[in-house]
Amino acid sequence: MKQIQTKVDWKKIAFEGIEGKRITKEDALAILEADDTEVLEIMNAAYMIRHHYFGKKVKLNMIINTKSGLCPEDCGYCSQSIVSEAPIDKYAWLTQEKIVEGAHEAVRRKAGTYCIVASGRRPTDKEVNHVIGAVKEIKETTDLKICCCLGFLNEDQAKRLAEAGVHRYNHNLNTHANHYDNICSTHTYDDRVDTVEKVKQAGISPCSGAIFGMGETKEERVEIAFELQRLDADSIPCNFLVSVKGTPFEGRKELTPVECLKILAMMRFVNPSKEIRISGGRELNLRSVQPLGLFAANSIFVGDYLTTVGQESTADWEMIQDLGFEIEECAL
């Protein structure tokens, strides 16, 4: 006799999450393994959690790539790595004036957070000073929250960034520890965890997430979500692999839009009160179902990414408005 599979009550699990009961790894995995016909029910339950903590608000973030390419690390997914042959722009540090101009552009795009990103393994003290100079001017002229993503930091660098007014520091775990050697050999998973811990100790809000679609298993996707829970990351970017031509990961099979939705929902269930951001690869992987992603996530990037093109900000504003959601804005 064929065994009848018991249907999961996603709303019940969502209610329990709102009341403080943490989802189990088994139920988190069940989200990823659910039949595609259940995805709307899953997203509806995820929205219950999202709405409880964030209402109808959507946070917008904008990136500036202040130093592009020329990175000594061999991350297989990255077009800026030493092993990449991707035809990208390569340049040293932008001037402080250019970084400040980018902040004003972020405000015009209705972003509330401005992320200053630089390629490379780790910044020198001189480079940290360069960023600090720009941060101070931005803080004087806008209400933007400043996020930095500069690579590995030592304790003194983290402390100085905090003192300068850096609100958040991004350092993604990227994938599960068991899978890390398959994507990079020049540093370790533990190196990344160490930097997240350092910025937390300095009083900076930790931003850390993952890139999905790099050959990891569904179980490993669940494990990375729980590791981010353990690290208490305040902001969790969910990136979906863009297999850039010229990188070792060129030609990797893309995730389906429904797979991406399940990942976003799972991340919301595991980290109910955290900012979940649909990040790199949003347009390519989610495609026509991008709006549905915001029923689990409460944050997106506007404008371009590091080396790939995003959609027009006006399209993002319209998407948010059409959903009946509202943008969290800051002002000059």
From Swiss-Prot:
**Domain (Radical SAM core): residue spans on this chain:** 53-282
**SUPFAM superfamilies reported for this sequence:** Radical SAM enzymes
Q: Name the Gene Ontology biological process terms.
A: biotin biosynthetic process
Q: Does the keyword Iron-sulfur apply?
A: yes
Q: Report keywords, A-Z.
A: 2Fe-2S, 4Fe-4S, Biotin biosynthesis, Iron, Iron-sulfur, Metal-binding, S-adenosyl-L-methionine, Transferase
Where does the source fall among the domains of life? Bacteria
- Supply the Pfam families for this chain: BATS, Radical_SAM
Q: Which residues bind [4Fe-4S] cluster?
A: C71, C75, C78
What's the EC number here?
2.8.1.6
Q: Please share the entry's free-text remark on the cofactor.
A: Binds 1 [4Fe-4S] cluster. The cluster is coordinated with 3 cysteines and an exchangeable S-adenosyl-L-methionine.
CDD domains the record matches: Radical_SAM
Q: Where is the signal peptide?
A: none
**Annotated pathway, please?**
Cofactor biosynthesis; biotin biosynthesis; biotin from 7,8-diaminononanoate: step 2/2
| Cofactor(s) it depends on | [4Fe-4S] cluster; [2Fe-2S] cluster
Substrates-to-products reaction catalysed: (4R,5S)-dethiobiotin + (sulfur carrier)-SH + 2 reduced [2Fe-2S]-[ferredoxin] + 2 S-adenosyl-L-methionine = (sulfur carrier)-H + biotin + 2 5'-deoxyadenosine + 2 L-methionine + 2 oxidized [2Fe-2S]-[ferredoxin]
Recorded GO MF terms: 2 iron, 2 sulfur cluster binding; 4 iron, 4 sulfur cluster binding; biotin synthase activity; iron ion binding
What InterPro entries does the entry give? Aldolase_TIM, BATS_dom, Biotin_synth/BioAB, Biotin_synthase, Elp3/MiaA/NifB-like_rSAM, rSAM
Specify which residues bind [2Fe-2S] cluster according to the UniProt entry for this protein.
C115, C147, C207, R277
The answer, when asked if Transferase is one of the entry's keywords, is yes
Enzyme group, top EC level? transferase
Quaternary arrangement and interactors, per the entry?
Answer: Homodimer.
Q: Which family does it belong to?
A: Belongs to the radical SAM superfamily. Biotin synthase family.
Q: Which NCBIfam families match?
A: bioB
What the protein does? Catalyzes the conversion of dethiobiotin (DTB) to biotin by the insertion of a sulfur atom into dethiobiotin via a radical-based mechanism.
Q: What is this protein called?
A: Biotin synthase
Q: Which organism was this protein described from?
A: Bacillus cytotoxicus (strain DSM 22905 / CIP 110041 / 391-98 / NVH 391-98)
